[in-house]
């Protein structure tokens, strides 16, 4: 008998496809959370592979804070149209009416109202019982201890001290009425794995991941791109054109750019091989307080 050996990327791919198919078969109303970033793009690619030549048997859902980069929204709509996907876009209209925003109310309040509460609204509205997310364990310490099947109570809260064991590739999806799970098919991937897979599979991405001259201002050691005229400039503050790109994407006022000349996937991968910092250092929301990500997840965040 000939041994059949998979590369580590093909092993990760097979594991993720298995998880996606398992959830589609086991739950009544799954949904794939689509944040438009590189991890979401890989997860969507895996979902399309899992059910090819058919379409994924669940919709995509984007929780729109109204503060995403303009390039992200354009890319989102292009991808949905290109692949004929069922796309749900949910906005917390109560937050919009209150004028909640990162500049007027701060990152913590903005994230809570326009992301966490908005997500919970959407999950309740459409009665989804399983939601795929693109989080990875190497991103941040609270995500490192979260299971692939992450159970949430009827209020969508996560209890890190009450997680089910996951042995090998066996997942327990039994839930009580009103409960739900968040599912993370990319849990065991690293940032470098993601970039190598994108290169291998020729996956399309938002242009913001590639270096270009962009208008930025530096605030508290973070380079923030001026994406539209809603961003108030401080006295004496003038946007400077710099060669920058983004390792992670979110709301533009809360996402820091990095100086880079990497304009191609091989150049980005080369940068990843040399970097010693986390991609989430550019996320302002992660610096709100000690353990802020775990607290957000306990409250129902992605």
Curated annotation (Swiss-Prot):
SUPFAM superfamilies: Adenine nucleotide alpha hydrolases-like. GO terms for biological process: hydrogen sulfide biosynthetic process; sulfate assimilation. GO terms for molecular function: ATP binding; sulfate adenylyltransferase (ATP) activity. Its EC number is 2.7.7.4. Signal peptide: none annotated. Pathway: Sulfur metabolism; hydrogen sulfide biosynthesis; sulfite from sulfate: step 1/3. It catalyses: sulfate + ATP + H(+) = adenosine 5'-phosphosulfate + diphosphate. The keyword NADP does not apply. Residues 280-302 are annotated as: Disordered. InterPro entries: PAPS_reduct_dom, Rossmann-like_a/b/a_fold, SO4_adenylTrfase_ssu, Sulfate_adenylyltrnsfr_sub2. Keywords: ATP-binding, Nucleotide-binding, Nucleotidyltransferase, Transferase. The keyword ATP-binding applies. PANTHER family: SULFATE ADENYLYLTRANSFERASE SUBUNIT 2. Heterodimer composed of CysD, the smaller subunit, and CysN. With CysN forms the ATP sulfurylase (ATPS) that catalyzes the adenylation of sulfate producing adenosine 5'-phosphosulfate (APS) and diphosphate, the first enzymatic step in sulfur assimilation pathway. APS synthesis involves the formation of a high-energy phosphoric-sulfuric acid anhydride bond driven by GTP hydrolysis by CysN coupled to ATP hydrolysis by CysD. Belongs to the PAPS reductase family. CysD subfamily. NCBIfam families: CysD, PRK05253.1, PRK12563.1. This is Sulfate adenylyltransferase subunit 2. The gene is cysD.
